[in-house]
Amino acid sequence: MAKRILIYTNHFYPEQFKINDVVDWLGSSNNEIRVVTCIPNYPSGKFYKNYSLPNSFIDNNIIVNRLPLIPRGNGGSFMLLLNYLSYFFSCILFTLYLGIFVKKYDVVLVHHTSPFLIALNPIIYRIFNKPKCFLWDLDIWPETLEAVNIIKSSHIIDLLRKIVIFTYSFYDKILISSIGLKSVIQARFKNDIEYFPNWADKEIEEISEDSKIDLNIPKDRFVIMYTGNIGQSQNFDLLIETIKYFNPTKNVFWVFVGDGRFKNNFIKKLTTERLQQNCMFTGYVDSKKIPAYSKYADAMYLSLSDNVIFNNTLPAKLQTYLALSKPIVAVLKGEGEKIILESNSGIVESNNDYLSLSIKIDNLIKLPKKELNQLGING
């Protein structure tokens, strides 16, 4: 039976998040969908071209409402605070409008990426209606804030944790993308918790042979490619030391496909160390083009900072990398490490040791082409 479904998300098309697929799937089942989101500005911090004003549009049975907010800008703490709060207040006002003037929704789904404020909206909506509420929890607060040193005060962390626990109590079910997160959620939430694993982007599964990208990559180099957000949680400081290790031999070339808060700082550090000649930054790339870019790669790179909460997280890009049939070079622990090792689809450095990582990459480079390709096929 078709339902009326209200979806809150911090990110939506043209921003590249899994919620885009979920909306398509739910919409294809004749459900009436309303997506409440903001003007896209992630990860560059600037509004996307042709998306600079609040607007609403209807596509068959899907309504999308883009609410106003202050863009992330350079990603500094003050700009992020303005970005978070401006969208939060826009959401609260719009939720009041929905509750008072719009026909009741049967289900509310919250796609939670930072900030957690997005998860508060069903509390307001439930003043007027009593829908089933689902939280797709992809970013565990306040631990994530603590892990990337955004908040260092233990008192503030404790306060935020109490707010999160209070908010959870309004949900009927929480969806998690990693089994490792279940124990964290169970300590706060007594209702239903369901494992909802990530999947490879449909564009990856439907690779077009017509896609052609020209990259000026030096010949006779082993190319390691990273795609996605270039942020603080990706542990790029360790990677700088690894890039430095290979600098004398000049046999590895690094390609970074994406954008993010840490990108400029990362490039600055590479330049200071005189390593920039071994790297290429493409900037933001539509996910549809990732398969074409990956054809230049001998291996795909994946990393997360060494932190308890990140060690229990399964990065969404892991499924994408596996679907690309490329060997994986990973710096992480936990569930992601287990998947890569058990599938024999690449190498993993779990001790946050750049020298160990460098030696493993060196061994990977020395593999016969057939064995290297087999790692990708295993994925």
Where are these regions (language model features)?
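Nucleotide-activated donor-binding/catalytic signature segment of Leloir-type glycosyltransferases, i.e.
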Residues: V257, N264-P291
